């Protein structure tokens, strides 16, 4: 198998645009620093072409054995493509065992096929920073040293005292006051005497945010608990007014529904508005108002049951 089997032709369209953007992020100055750092640790020459000098993986595996001895036990010297890819895979595995973050790694094809040399450069810079963090001394100052953990242990008393401390993100209440504020529940008017606006004509002016109940009344409402009778057109009873209420509005005359016919209307009975109806509870019947002997009662049997409640 020839060494040119994995080579690709030129890219076009979107692939070419992506490749050009990745190449634009490549830093030649960082490449020169990495070249000096690798050659100083391994003693091997990378060559003028950075990608071709590292694509076989021999120099990179040697670098990892210098940073962490024995991390790559076998280095393939063959020029076959799968041997070179195996070296790159072993180098990536050695970086993981060295403590590299997964986001800082690159794939073998990124270097072997020049797919993403920018990511290769980022990975090698992160490797140099990890080596500096572990105390490696080299003649080239490259990479960023990782920060170390600064752990603090506090006792329970200190932790409880910290609960009373207001962080700077919470703001401050040192300048807050309620001077000039009216008492809670006081009427707030929509006029300002400083602007020479006349005061309201009455005391019904309130803020728009407060709403109003000035027009609410209970005129025409019956007292709570007033008896509501049931009328039935089959029994010859008629409505006294238009105050009829459906059965769904409730029934308060008993705990059962015996004798009720669902679906019929209900009306609120009041002798003031129904002069032809039976007399109010407890009121004596006038002479001649009651039924004579043998005559049926004007009130239907249902009214007589209701009156006995």
Curated annotation (Swiss-Prot):
Calponin-homology (CH) domain ranges (all copies): 28-132
Calponin-like repeats: 166-191, 206-231, 245-269
Example of a GO cellular component annotation carried by this entry: actin cytoskeleton
Phosphoserine, modified sites: 138
Pfam families per the UniProt record, alphabetical: Calponin, CH
GO biological process: actin filament organization; actomyosin structure organization
InterPro entries reported for this sequence: Calponin-like, Calponin/LIMCH1, Calponin_repeat, CH_dom, CH_dom_sf, SM22_calponin
Biased composition, class Low complexity, residue ranges: 277-288
Family per similarity comment: Belongs to the calponin family.
Its job: Thin filament-associated protein that is implicated in the regulation and modulation of smooth muscle contraction. It is capable of binding to actin, calmodulin and tropomyosin. The interaction of calponin with actin inhibits the actomyosin Mg-ATPase activity.
Protein name: Calponin-2
Organism encoding this protein: Bos taurus (Bovine)
Gene: CNN2
